[in-house]
């Protein structure tokens, strides 16, 4: 009997919490709402030590925080959510820690793609961004399955950056742009003797047309599926970007709450949205000038 009553109370509290949240989001929606929020999920290990948890449980608590934040962003009307899950630099950690994180990552990826998962209930499409070749086969295949399984979802987009750094992304985009331009130029050499390439070199207009520009690099970025972020939230109080979205973050708001990632909550999101709305005109003007 107590168990049944406990469930009823829990369900009632959840309904009240959801109602209050919807009221708050309705008020916030009167002002501008960001289309893209990115998160640097910092502090899982420190949270584990702080709470005297077993290895890996800090990251499990962090996953729960991600699910809650994903739900809040969706309810607020944020179309794009990006999370920095695993840097290329993280491969330099102790081998046993990397193996443990890879196992946990695979477990949580599979959990996200279940029929009853939050991403399917809310219609969220998942992209994994980064140098996926660096991942173990099991994790890479799980990521690929998740992208295929959620490809029909269109209400919001969750980009999960794994085996990612911004410098690697930029190098990748420049390489792809060079190869694309070279293929275009080679197609002009119909005689395969270089004569058309010489004429191209002499024609200033054509030469400029085949130069690599910012738009070419933008198109080949891992993050090309999303607009530039409006807000980057890094937990644990650190203000550095740690090689995350350096190309895309020149005109976004950076928020660094002292809370560790598993401790992040609704109040932090509300605060940063209010800060974004206060600075909206300034940020908009800066984007126009760029």
UniProtKB/Swiss-Prot annotation:
It catalyses: n isopentenyl diphosphate + (2E,6E)-farnesyl diphosphate = a di-trans,poly-cis-polyprenyl diphosphate + n diphosphate. GO terms for biological process: polyprenol biosynthetic process. Its cofactor is Mg(2+). Pfam families: Prenyltransf. GO terms for cellular component: cytosol; endoplasmic reticulum. Its main location: cytoplasm. InterPro entries: UPP_synth-like, UPP_synth-like_CS, UPP_synth-like_sf. Its EC number is 2.5.1.87. Belongs to the UPP synthase family. Catalyzes cis-prenyl chain elongation to produce the polyprenyl backbone of dolichol, a glycosyl carrier-lipid required for the biosynthesis of several classes of glycoprotein. This is Dehydrodolichyl diphosphate synthase CPT3. It comes from Solanum lycopersicum.
């Amino acid at each position: 009997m107590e168990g049944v009553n406990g469930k009823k109370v829990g369900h009632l509290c959840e309904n009240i919490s959801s109602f209050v949240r919807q009221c708050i989001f309705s008020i916030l929606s009167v002002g501008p709402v960001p289309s893209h929020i990115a998160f640097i999920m910092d502090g899982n290990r420190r949270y584990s030590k702080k709470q005297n948890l077993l290895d890996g449980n800090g990251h499990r608590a962090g996953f729960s925080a991600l699910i809650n934040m994903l739900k809040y962003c969706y309810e607020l009307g944020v179309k794009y959510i990006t999370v920095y899950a695993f840097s290329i630099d993280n491969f330099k950690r102790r081998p046993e820690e990397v193996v443990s994180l890879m196992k946990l990552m695979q477990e949580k990826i599979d959990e996200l793609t279940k029929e009853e998962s939050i991403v399917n209930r809310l219609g969220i499409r998942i992209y994994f961004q980064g140098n996926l070749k660096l991942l173990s086969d099991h994790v890479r295949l799980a990521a690929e399955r998740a992208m295929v399984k959620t490809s029909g979802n269109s209400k919001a987009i969750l980009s999960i950056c794994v085996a990612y750094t911004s410098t690697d992304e930029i190098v990748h985009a420049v390489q792809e742009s060079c190869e694309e331009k070279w293929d275009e130029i080679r197609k002009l050499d119909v005689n395969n003797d270089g004569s058309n390439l010489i004429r191209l070199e002499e024609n200033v207009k054509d030469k400029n047309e085949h130069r690599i520009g910012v738009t070419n690099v933008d198109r080949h970025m891992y993050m090309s599926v999303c607009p530039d972020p409006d807000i980057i939230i890094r937990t644990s109080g650190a203000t550095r970007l740690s090689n995350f979205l350096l190309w895309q973050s020149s005109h976004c708001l950076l928020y660094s709450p002292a809370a560790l990632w598993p401790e992040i909550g609704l109040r932090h999101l509300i605060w940063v949205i209010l800060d974004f709305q206060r600075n909206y005109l300034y940020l908009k003007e800066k984007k126009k000038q760029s």
